[in-house]
């Protein structure tokens, strides 16, 4: 499902967002809501870091 404005996460995490060419476009620490409203439409990689573990997910910004 495409994301429009915000991404909600159940726990406080560190998040890095990368564009399609690998440039980091957002980096936030200790958050549970990520505002993506200012990102251009497209595909991004979302790196979620929690308790020294890293998970990467693809998101589509609408």
Give a label for each model feature.
Residues 3-62:
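C-terminal outer-membrane/trafficking sorting elements
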């Amino acid at each position: 499902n495409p994301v429009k404005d915000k991404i909600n996460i159940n726990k406080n995490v560190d998040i890095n967002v990368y564009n399609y060419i690998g440039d980091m476009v957002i980096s936030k620490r200790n958050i549970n809501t990520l505002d993506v409203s200012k990102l251009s439409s497209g595909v991004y990689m979302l790196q979620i870091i929690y308790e020294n573990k890293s998970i990467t997910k693809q998101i589509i910004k609408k």
